[in-house]
Curated annotation (Swiss-Prot):
Expressed by the venom gland. The lineage of its organism: Eukaryota, Metazoa, Chordata, Craniata, Vertebrata. GO terms for molecular function: toxin activity. It comes from Bungarus multicinctus. This is Muscarinic toxin-like protein. InterPro entries: Snake_3FTx, Snake_toxin-like_sf, Snake_toxin_con_site, Toxin_cobra-type. Disulfide bonds join C24-C45, C38-C62, C66-C78, C79-C84. It is found in: Secreted. It comes from the Eukaryota. GO terms for cellular component: extracellular region. Homodimer; non-covalently linked. Residues 1-21 form the signal peptide. CDD domains: TFP_snake_toxin (cd00206).
Length: 86
């Protein structure tokens, strides 16, 4: 009986984890904070800062893979926790 209960507990925990989705911020630099629930298997949040003269633009959202770093004045931050791209 104990084995059956332990098996059911493990199966329940595994099944609960399968449905997990990441929550990321998705607002731009000068807009109020908003979030989005990422699509299945999109586990990363990103934050891209782009310097344009005296102005800095920031874009946030969900992504399947982390954006590539390029030497173009961009700062890219990628993470895997809920709301980690603030």
């Amino acid at each position: 009986m104990k084995t059956l209960l332990l098996t059911l507990a493990v199966v329940t925990m595994v099944c609960m984890d399968l449905g997990y989705t990441t929550i990321c911020y998705n607002h731009l630099s000068r807009t109020p904070e908003t979030t989005e629930i990422c699509p299945d298997s999109w586990y990363f949040c990103y934050k891209i800062s782009l310097a344009d003269g005296n102005d800095v633009r920031i874009k946030r959202g969900c992504t399947f893979t982390c954006p590539e770093l390029r030497p173009t004045g961009k700062y890219v931050y990628c993470c895997r926790r809920d709301k980690c791209n603030q």
